[in-house]
């Protein structure tokens, strides 16, 4: 089976979003222990509360929370690809390793595209 170049590019863009892009913004904030340095109790109470919470957590606890947030982001991407497949949206009707969500998981794990 050969998929269009666009398919591989989109899956790889989603992988990048998970490991280095939008999916890592919250992860990096949690690891740093600061959700929003500009937040105050008056101006942004929820973000300030997040800062207070993160400050109380140990590095190990922050790493655990970061892992959970990263997993949730990946889960959202996974579910989106499943929905595209179920709706038979081109080019996501199927994938190389089952469905496109399987290809996402494979690429996140270092799997190479067929023919590469």
What are these regions (language model features)?
Residues 59-60, 64, 71, 75:
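Surface-exposed, polar/charged faces of alpha-helical domains
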Residues 75-116:
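Amphipathic alpha-helical binding modules
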Residues 1-59, 82, 86, 91-94:
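N-terminal low-complexity, intrinsically disordered segments
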Residues 50, 65-66:
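A structural signal for short hydrophobic/aromatic patches embedded in well-ordered alpha helices
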Residues 6, 27, 65, 103-105:
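Alpha-helical protein-protein interaction elements
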